[in-house]
């Protein structure tokens, strides 16, 4: 028995196994992308994977990219313009309304952080001007380190904390009301509360009809 030839065959089989695994992974990734875009998956051949011009990657839809820059107010306006949209998923980009609301909420927080930073700078300048000749009476500065324990103490600004709390409550209420209206519209239009895609919608409608017929 020629062990050298056996070793070469084993190496060749390993290389083929790796190639097949890579091709299978590319095919699976491509099909996942098509399914997420609500398109019917195509039938592929192994030769398609070898196409030099093919590039497979994680790409985001333009609608999802725009959603990252929406504020809650812009989200509400967008929702009013799309009352017929799907409950579980938008028609084009595959982004759910929950994700859209989350992105809108995150942008609102970023805007609020910028506003509070500017407000903090203005308040600090005003305090320094008013208290130039006023000695500090045990007031903790912005950041203070205990030399014995090494702990850092940061003084809270009550004004900014209260402003943040009020803003978060207001934005949370707006997002809740927007989501509630959207769910009510979907229930009125389709008779089902939510669905992921067209097949799921048809299945939910069928269940709804059967449940009404059995009553």
Swiss-Prot record:
Subunit structure and binding partners: Belongs to the NTC complex (or PRP19-associated complex), composed of at least CEF1, CLF1, ISY1, NTC20, SNT309, SYF1, SYF2, and PRP19.
Further remark: Present with 1670 molecules/cell in log phase SD medium.
Compartments it resides in: Nucleus
Give the superkingdom in one word: Eukaryota
Look up the coiled coil feature and give its residue ranges: none
Q: Which GO terms describe its cellular component?
A: cytosol; nucleus; Prp19 complex; U2-type catalytic step 1 spliceosome; U2-type catalytic step 2 spliceosome; U2-type post-mRNA release spliceosomal complex; U2-type prespliceosome
- Which range is the signal sequence, renumbered to this chain? none
Primary localisation category: nucleus
Keyword Nucleus belongs to the record: yes
Per its database record, what is this protein's job?
Answer: Involved in pre-mRNA splicing and cell cycle control. As a component of the NTC complex (or PRP19-associated complex), associates to the spliceosome to mediate conformational rearrangement or to stabilize the structure of the spliceosome after U4 snRNA dissociation, which leads to spliceosome maturation. The cell cycle arrest of SYF2 defective cells may be due to the inefficient splicing of TUB1.
Q: Which GO terms describe its biological process?
A: mRNA splicing, via spliceosome
> Which positions bear Phosphoserine?
45, 124-125
What is this protein called in UniProt? Pre-mRNA-splicing factor SYF2
């Amino acid at each position: 028995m020629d062990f050298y030839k056996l070793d070469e065959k084993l190496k060749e089989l390993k290389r083929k196994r790796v190639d097949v695994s890579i091709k299978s992974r590319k095919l699976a990734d491509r099909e996942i992308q098509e399914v997420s875009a609500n398109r019917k998956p195509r039938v592929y051949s192994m030769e398609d994977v070898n196409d030099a011009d093919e590039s497979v990657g994680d790409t985001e839809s333009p609608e999802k990219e725009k959603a990252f820059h929406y504020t809650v107010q812009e989200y509400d306006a967008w929702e009013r313009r799309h009352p017929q949209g799907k409950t579980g998923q938008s028609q084009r980009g595959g982004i759910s309304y929950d994700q859209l609301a989350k992105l809108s909420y995150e942008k609102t927080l970023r805007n609020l952080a910028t506003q509070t930073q500017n407000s903090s700078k203005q308040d600090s300048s005003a305090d320094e001007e008013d208290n130039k000749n006023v000695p500090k009476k045990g007031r903790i500065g912005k950041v203070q380190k205990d030399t014995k324990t090494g702990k850092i103490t940061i003084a809270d600004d009550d004004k900014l904390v209260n402003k943040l709390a009020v803003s978060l409550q207001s934005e949370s209420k707006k997002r809740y009301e927007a989501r509630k209206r959207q769910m009510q519209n979907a229930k009125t239009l389709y008779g089902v509360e939510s669905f992921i895609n067209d097949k799921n919608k048809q299945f939910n409608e069928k269940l709804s009809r059967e449940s009404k017929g059995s009553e």
